[in-house]
Structures are given as structure tokens and as C-alpha cells.
Swiss-Prot record:
Substrate binds at R13, R30, K41, E52. The record marks T262 as: Essential for prephenate dehydratase activity. This is Bifunctional chorismate mutase/prephenate dehydratase. GO terms for molecular function: chorismate mutase activity; prephenate dehydratase activity. Residues 3-91 form the Chorismate mutase domain. It comes from Neisseria gonorrhoeae (strain ATCC 700825 / FA 1090). Pathway: Amino-acid biosynthesis; L-phenylalanine biosynthesis; phenylpyruvate from prephenate: step 1/1; Metabolic intermediate biosynthesis; prephenate biosynthesis; prephenate from chorismate: step 1/1. Catalyzes the Claisen rearrangement of chorismate to prephenate and the decarboxylation/dehydration of prephenate to phenylpyruvate. Disulfide bonds: none annotated. It catalyses: chorismate = prephenate; prephenate + H(+) = 3-phenylpyruvate + CO2 + H2O. It is found in: Cytoplasm. Pfam families: ACT, CM_2, PDT. The keyword Nucleotidyltransferase does not apply. Residues 92-269 form the Prephenate dehydratase domain.
């Protein structure tokens, strides 16, 4: 007599139960070792970005499937987040309110066990870490379609904090509405200025007559719509904001560029050690004379150092002087980069190492 489906499932379910029990035992054993490490460190830094990245890269190298590498890395990010919380939960400042893409980036980098602190402005994010009310901050630095976030660059040039990580987040915008799943009757659309720009073509086609109103963040737009009694308003925000504020998804993925991506920097008080695959962010200023910029870059190009970003921004202190924000491959403690930075310092009127940090794994 042939076995039923339920009977055929029994050995697999029994095996899964056994495996789950072993996973649980090993997770708690790992947490015990994490706690012991925390005791040995004492008041030292409990978060080591280069160590976490090394673990994730090693796990991906060991992975034989069928789980994809990214899924395995996400799982172990959460494991490390929970184990780190056993040592001491981290507090992460981000541009609020709750539900912003910056909060998503913070959770992607630090895991759900970290405490996230919503701040009203990017300036306040920096202040919370500088005054040690938070351990780290996550701030948007550039978007693939709209370019750099100017206020973040301004703060990077003057803060004493160090860049210690980066987060790359795919951005999907959705049109949200309160108790209404239709585009009919929408007269106003609230969102962050960059989100409105990133959805410009879609809005022009589908809501050509709707007024576009810029607010401090996408999540703030969702909050405003959720609290409004005006049935003609809508917001552009992420799925997380829709869930938090109880809004209907009228249209999904309305961004004009399907590969829309935002890069964030993680800032803290400590320098980060080399991980083997790093970036270094710099802020430099050239003397105001002909050929100064070409001369400025010469130490990097002659050393064969690869630049992944080069952008100018007006200086806030000297009229008609510009700051150049440069990202290079490698760590500031690498001998080749140390030499290049020394030569750069001889040519520049201002040089600041914003920080060296591991390239994003997730």
C-alpha cells in the first residue's frame, strides 16, 4: 500500500526539527562567545566593521547553496546583530521619521537588534553621535539618478566623526493613499524633493495636474497623508512607510529608473581597520590657481590609485573656493595610499580623510 503525502513528509519534518534544535544550540553558543568577547573588550568598541565584513565574506565563500549568497549574508547579519546586542545594543541615528529609506539602510547594515533613533534632520543625526547620545549614524550621501546629498557632504567636511561603513540600497517608490486604492481625485502629492524628481516622468503621465509638494522625507509625507482628512492627497514613499502608517498602495515601483540606488555612509567615533576590500573618502581643496586641480589629482593617478568618485561643492568658508569629495579604492593605512596622501597634502590647501571602510557586502 502506497504511503500518503503526510507519511512521506514525516522523515523530512523530523529532520528539520532535529536541525532546528541544533541551530538553536549553536546560536546560543555563539552568543555566549560574543558575550565573552564583550567582557574582554570592557569599555572598548564592541562593533568592528572590518570583522563583520570578514565574517560575511567568509560565509559567502563557504556557501554551497541552495540558498543564494545574498540570503545567507542577510541571515548572518541578523545573527551578528543579535549577538552584538548580547554584548551591548547599539543606538543608530537616522533621518526620520520612522519608515524612511535611511532607517531601512540602518537596519540593513546593523540588523534589527540595533536600536534606531529617528532624527528630524541630517544635522541632528551628526549631533546625536558627536554628543554620544547615539553610537553611529547612517546618512544618505548620493543617489544614482539625482547625485549627491549636499547637506551630508557639507557635514562630512567639518565633522570629527569617521566614516566606518557604507550601505547600498535599491530604492523603490510607491504611490500611497489613505483608504483609497485609486489615482482618481488626487490633487496633491507629498514626498521628499529627490523622490519627486525620481518619479517625474510617471507623475507627468499619470498625475499631470497634481501639485507636487516637497517635505523633509518620504516617511514624513506618508505620515502627513495618514493624519490628513483631505481625501485628495497622496504620498510617494517606500513599502515600509505604507505598512507603518496604514496607507494603501495605489501604484508600486513608480521610479523612472529601475536601477535607482542610494548610497549611505555610516559614521562613528573610531577608525576602522583594513578588511582587504576597502574605500577611503576624502575632502580636499585646491589653491585658486590655473592647473591646481590637475596637480591635486596627480599623486593619485601616478600611484595607480583608482578613484570611484570625484565631485566638487562650493566651500562654505571661502568665496569661490571649492571642496572636492573623492572616493578611492583601498585603505588609508595602505602604504601606497599613505604615500599618495602625503604628496596630496603638499599640493592641497585642505585635506581631510573622512574615513576608510569596507566596501558594502549586501
Amino acid at each position: 500500500m502506497s504511503q500518503t503525502i503526510d507519511e512521506l513528509l514525516i522523515p523530512h519534518r523530523n529532520a528539520i526539527d532535529t536541525i532546528d534544535a541544533e541551530i538553536l544550540r549553536l546560536l546560543n553558543e555563539r552568543a555566549q562567545h560574543a558575550h565573552a568577547i564583550g567582557e574582554l573588550k570592557g569599555t572598548g568598541a564592541v562593533y568592528r566593521p572590518e570583522r563583520e565584513v570578514a565574517v560575511l565574506r567568509r560565509i559567502q565563500d563557504l556557501n554551497k547553496g541552495p540558498l543564494p549568497d545574498e540570503s545567507v549574508a542577510r541571515l548572518f547579519r541578523e545573527v551578528m546583530s543579535e549577538c552584538l546586542a548580547v554584548e551591548r545594543p547599539l543606538t543608530i541615528a537616522y533621518l526620520g521619521p520612522q519608515g524612511t529609506f535611511t532607517q531601512q539602510a540602518a537596519i540593513k547594515h546593523f540588523g534589527h537588534a540595533a536600536h534606531t533613533m529617528a532624527c528630524p534632520t541630517i544635522d541632528d543625526c551628526f549631533k546625536q553621535v558627536e554628543t554620544r547620545q547615539a553610537d553611529y549614524l547612517v546618512a544618505p550621501v548620493e543617489n544614482s539618478t539625482e547625485g549627491s546629498v549636499g547637506r551630508t557632504l557639507d557635514l562630512l567636511a567639518v565633522t570629527a566623526l569617521q566614516a566606518c561603513g557604507e550601505v547600498v540600497l535599491r530604492i523603490h517608490h510607491n504611490l500611497l493613499r489613505k483608504n483609497n486604492g485609486s489615482t482618481e481625485g488626487i490633487a496633491k502629492v507629498f514626498s521628499h524633493a529627490q523622490a519627486l524628481a525620481q518619479c517625474n516622468d510617471w507623475l507627468g503621465r499619470r498625475l499631470p495636474n497634481a501639485e507636487r509638494i516637497a517635505v523633509s522625507s518620504n516617511a514624513e509625507a506618508a505620515r502627513l497623508v495618514a493624519e490628513s482628512d483631505d481625501g485628495t492627497v497622496a504620498a510617494i514613499a517606500g513599502r515600509t512607510a505604507a505598512e507603518i502608517y496604514g496607507l494603501d498602495m495605489v501604484a508600486e515601483c513608480i521610479e523612472d529608473e529601475p536601477n535607482n540606488t542610494t548610497r549611505f555612509l555610516v559614521m562613528g567615533h573610531h577608525e576602522t581597520g583594513a578588511s582587504g576590500s576597502d574605500k577611503t573618502s576624502l575632502a580636499v581643496s585646491a589653491p585658486n590657481r590655473a592647473g591646481a586641480v590637475a596637480s591635486l589629482l596627480q599623486p593619485l593617478t601616478e600611484s595607480g590609485i583608482s578613484m570611484t568618485k570625484f565631485e566638487s561643492r562650493p566651500s562654505k568658508s571661502v568665496l569661490w573656493e571649492y571642496l572636492f569629495f573623492i572616493d578611492i579604492e583601498g585603505h588609508r593605512r595602505d602604504a601606497q595610499i599613505q604615500t599618495a596622501l602625503e604628496r596630496l597634502g603638499e599640493r592641497a590647501s585642505f585635506v581631510k580623510a573622512i574615513g576608510s571602510y569596507p566596501t558594502a557586502v549586501l
